[in-house]
Regions:
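The conserved cystathionine-beta-synthase
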Residues: 14-33, 39-40
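A glycine-centered beta-loop-beta connector
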Residues: 1, 7, 28, 36-54
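Bateman (tandem CBS) regulatory domains
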Residues: 1-12, 149
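Conserved residues at the C-terminal ends of beta-strands
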Residues: 10, 39, 156
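A nucleotide- and high-energy phosphate-metabolite-utilizing enzyme signature
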Residues: 64-393
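Histidine- and aromatic-rich ligand-binding microenvironments
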Residues: 20, 53-54, 149
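Sensory coupling linkers of modular signal transduction proteins
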Residues: 52-66
Length: 393
């Protein structure tokens, strides 16, 4: 008879008992699995969950999209599948929390990136050394919205440091091709050129450590202004253990670097939420609009990043970082919940605005809100201000 090794599923993916059904659906989609292992707090087997258990008619579009992405054998087909993801995401904006919608978008976008890497890799003969495709910024945090560009890089490990430049020149044409494929799939080139096809962000493990060490030894807070998105990196394709190794090194070196953390906090505190003493909101003088990203969600993202680096938290998502920080610092549960709900509400408004395409992305007129939304946004900004007050280093 056939050996069990020929029919078994390797690389078992597990989730804790505390994981939501939504997280389980996303894990099934991302890894193209039929079953997930559920473990308890000690890591012991607690049960199994299957696609049949989790998928309803309301969520079948996930399976359809996953199948379309996996079936794409050329750029045109992949671009069409990516377009379908964005259309489905726009429909989901009113159905779930912003955290779930953004995570749903990011996971499916991960599959698009994986397919883009596979398509590009078939065109090149890559070096036989470990390498990993990294996502930075919102994709690294699992917080991509409907309006997003690409921020990515490569980390590789040469057999000898002398081979670094030669290997980089081997990886760059491949990386640029992936960037081109992603652009064709609706992920525009990064305006700041934070892409793997840029030699600055196609680095060896040693070079990445040197890059982070340089940022962590900056002379002024200004030197860090354009570096923050790199501290949200996450593995997408290739040898994912390289990203884990780099993150372990980063957390080991960032937590006790008080000057670096103070500089990060100083930058995070440069702009506060747009709350007025007389009026409810301080809007832009010319447009009369609020910038929900710059003056809202950014505050939560920046604070969560700093707390994660200070406390050694490996989670890259803002909500996960705040949850972990709250547990480690003993924040009352109601404070953590209020903070998470405030961030989610601002993200929900951003998603709604991007779906409606009624004006500039991430900007909103207070007059467009109903009375309840107006009050909720005001309280969300207050929660942002409270969170900023916790950044004392």
């Amino acid at each position: 008879g056939e050996a069990v090794a020929g029919v078994m599923t390797g690389g078992v993916v597990s989730l804790p008992l505390t994981a939501s059904a939504h997280q389980a659906r996303l894990a099934l989609a991302c890894h193209d699995l039929r079953h997930l292992v559920v473990v308890d707090g000690r890591g012991a087997l607690a049960g199994l969950v299957s696609r049949v258990d989790l998928y309803t008619s309301r969520s079948l579009d996930v399976e359809d999209l996953v199948e379309a992405i996996h079936a794409a054998t050329n750029i045109a087909a992949l671009a069409q599948a990516a377009h379908r993801v964005r259309e489905a995401a726009a429909r989901r904006v009113e159905d779930g929390t912003a955290a779930h919608v953004c995570e749903w978008i990011a996971i499916l976008n991960d599959l698009v990136v994986l397919s883009a890497v596979d398509l590009a890799e078939a065109e090149f003969e890559l070096p036989l050394v470990p390498w990993c495709w990294l996502a930075f910024g919102s994709e690294g945090r699992l917080e991509q919205t409907l309006d997003t560009d690409q921020d990515n890089g490569i980390v590789f490990v040469p057999e000898s440091e002398r081979d670094t430049e030669t290997l980089r020149q081997r990886f760059l044409p491949f990386a640029r091709r992936v960037n081109e494929v992603l652009d064709a799939c609706g992920f525009p080139f990064c305006k700041g050129d934070v892409m793997a096809g840029n030699p600055r962000w196609c680095l060896s493990m040693t070079e990445w450590r040197g890059q982070f060490a340089g940022w962590m030894s900056c002379a002024t807070p200004d030197d860090l202004l354009n570096a923050t998105i790199f501290f949200d990196f996450r593995a997408i394709a290739g040898d994912v253990t390289l990203a884990a190794r780099l993150q372990q090194w980063l957390l080991a070196n960032a937590g006790d670097n008080d000057l670096f953390l103070r500089f990060m906090a100083a930058n995070a505190l440069r702009g506060g939420p747009p709350l007025g003493r007389i009026r409810d909101f301080v809007v832009d003088r010319e447009s009369g609009l609020l910038d929900l990203k710059r003056d809202g969600s950014r505050i939560f993202v920046d604070a969560a990043r700093i707390l994660a680096l200070a406390l050694g938290v490996s989670d890259t998502a803002t909500s996960g970082r705040l949850e972990a920080a709250g547990a480690l610092l003993g924040w009352p549960r109601r404070e953590v919940d209020a903070c998470l709900e405030a961030f989610d509400f601002i993200q929900q408004l951003r998603l709604r605005g991007q779906r409606e395409k009624a004006g500039p992305p991430n900007r909103i007129a207070p007059s467009a809100l109903n009375e309840l939304e107006h009050a909720f946004l005001k309280e969300s900004f207050r929660q942002a201000r409270k969170l900023q007050q916790k950044l004392q280093f």
